[in-house]
Amino acid sequence: MVGFGANRRGGRLPSFLLAALLLVIAVLAFNCWNAASRQAVLREELAELQSQAKRTEVARGRLEKRNSDLLGRVDSHRKQLEQKEADYSQLSSQLQARDGQVKRCEDSRVKLQNNISYQMADIHRLKEQLAELRQEFIRQEDQLHEYKKNNTYLTRRLEYDSLQCGQQIKEMRIQHEENIKKLMDQIVREQKATQRIQSSKDAEVNPNGDNQPISKTVPEMEVKNAENNELPSDRVVNGKEKVKPGGDAGMPEIEDNDPAKAEDTPTAPRSDNHHQADVNLPTEQPHAPNLAPGLHGDSDGNADIAKEIPPNSLQHLNFGENMDSQNENKIEADHLKLQKGRAVGLQKMKQNDEERDLQNDLVDYSKPRFGDGVL
């Protein structure tokens, strides 16, 4: 190596300068290449940035448009929000009004619950009363059924008894009229016998003087006896009795409750006993209803007449009168029973009407109370 103080050759560069120049050239070349490459890269980046700028412009326009749309939506949403706030205020006022209505409804509900509790107690009490009334109605129906059965039985028994009594009365009347006919025939025969005896005695006493008056009285007595014999025959014609205007025609239940008949019935046994006493006494003279006032029979003839008179005729009559009085008493008892049954039926109908009215009143009473509680 040559130092700084050494002599140089003339016309030749030193080597270190050449190296430095080469180094500088290399560095500059490298720098140019590097700058060119960087310029290319920058151009590419610039182109890319330009494309990005275009895209951003497009995107910015799109975003501005979207922003405008969003602003329109925001305005619409703001308007909707204001509308909803107004609706909210209105709904809040309505809610307050509803709260007031709810409170009033709660108060009315409490009142209705109290009314319902009272009405349930009333309904329970009325149900108990209804059950009792049903039991009473069933019992009354059973009694009515029994009364109807008894009524039908009594009516049938009454019809049967009235029919039997009518038949017995007819038989007794026929027997009584036959007995009366027999008695009248017997009395006529006795009268004829007494007239013969009297005429014979008068003939013995007055053989020539008084025959004509006696003969006159005898036809008169015969005419009277014939009339008396014809009287009972008028009652029976062809085996059938003629019905009297005041009679019962064989039906004792049709008779009116005449107090005179009821008063006459107990006196019949006395008259019967009196007649029996008159008949059973042989010493007394029996009463002959059809004898003439001037004619009297002998005591023996009267005793025979008393023996031949059947003592049971008056007893049959009194028995028929007693049967009539018994039938009248039965008819009165049946009428009283029928009247009692009708009174019971009317009372039941009144009770049923009262029950219906009570139920209707309860229904009408419950309706306005429920309406007042709701209002």
Curated annotation (Swiss-Prot):
Please give the residue ranges for the topological domain Cytoplasmic: 1-12
Carries keyword Membrane?
yes
Sorted UniProt keywords: Coiled coil, Membrane, Signal-anchor, Transmembrane, Transmembrane helix
Family designation: Belongs to the GOLM family.
Spans traversing the lipid bilayer: 13-33
Cellular component aspect of the GO annotation = membrane
The record places the following residue ranges in the Lumenal compartment, namely 34-375
Name recorded for this polypeptide: Protein GOLM2
- Keyword Membrane included in the entry's annotation: yes
Question: Where do the segments described as Disordered lie?
Answer: 81-102, 193-327, 342-375
Regarding the membrane, this protein is recorded as: Single-pass type II membrane protein
Q: Where are the annotated coiled coils located?
A: 34-198
Q: Composition bias, kind Basic and acidic residues: at what positions?
A: 193-204, 350-375
**PANTHER family, alphabetized:** GOLGI PHOSPHOPROTEIN 2/GP73-RELATED, PROTEIN GOLM2
| Location of the protein in the cell | Membrane
